[in-house]
């Protein structure tokens, strides 16, 4: 195996969760500017497309990263072990420091085809995928859920995953059936850690689910002794979620992050090949808590270009009465 960066991380370490159509190179750099986590994962890359001579062009932008983002981990999904083997070899050549396997995506057209969280119901295939991915020589980690249908599936499923000798397990503390409709099952953290200690003490354990910020993550790490904390949706409510010394933030800081997001979208649009409309999901992160925010968001949602969005921001900021503090 190549150098295992996981062993060099601080304890606890913090990860920005992989999120489809969210955690691309643009948004990762925005998060870095606000407050950087210890590890970045890419958004989802399909191994079947990656291994196809034509399909590769549709997913290559998902794997775009810059050297200042290291340690950079490629997050991949699929269900054919031989494709994971081939993908892992190529990812190592591309300079990634690790590979993370998606065994938790709950979306119906993924899970019901036996991929993502569907692999919870196919443990033998999941094991084959993990072992095949080691061919690239990079440390292999897994992101999964407690189970597919029921919470009590976690014991057999996680025992099986721990037995595969992986570098890190990121456990989303809900089942596939629960999606994100219920509170994460923090009450199971201690039992999961005990299972890890028994089966695979060298595998790191990262928790995910309803963790809004670094402060909460540190409290959970101190209480349960886990190794890592992964923050996902919390970053939409607080782009400064990974801040080591929390402080108050202002509306101008958020608008400055939006300007950065627009500039980075311009910079990487040739690599990512994304339409402008993909930006619209991000506007609500940056435009809130100030007079006129709702109207500005509405106007931004109707823009068709970076230039239009910038012009709206210029006009809005020129008329701002004051730079107000924002509750995150």
UniProtKB/Swiss-Prot annotation:
GO terms for molecular function: flavin adenine dinucleotide binding; tRNA binding; tRNA dihydrouridine synthase activity. The keyword Oxidoreductase applies. Signal peptide: none annotated. Catalyzes the synthesis of 5,6-dihydrouridine (D), a modified base found in the D-loop of most tRNAs, via the reduction of the C5-C6 double bond in target uridines. The gene is dus. SUPFAM superfamilies: FMN-linked oxidoreductases. It comes from Staphylococcus aureus (strain Mu50 / ATCC 700699). It catalyses: a 5,6-dihydrouridine in tRNA + NAD(+) = a uridine in tRNA + NADH + H(+); a 5,6-dihydrouridine in tRNA + NADP(+) = a uridine in tRNA + NADPH + H(+). This is Probable tRNA-dihydrouridine synthase. It comes from the Bacteria. InterPro entries: Aldolase_TIM (IPR013785), DUS-like_FMN-bd (IPR035587), DUS_fam (IPR001269), tRNA-dHydroUridine_Synthase_C (IPR024036), tRNA_hU_synthase_CS (IPR018517). It is an enzyme of class 1 (oxidoreductase). Belongs to the Dus family. Its cofactor is FMN. PANTHER family: DUS-LIKE FMN-BINDING DOMAIN-CONTAINING PROTEIN (PTHR11082:SF25), TRNA-DIHYDROURIDINE SYNTHASE (PTHR11082).
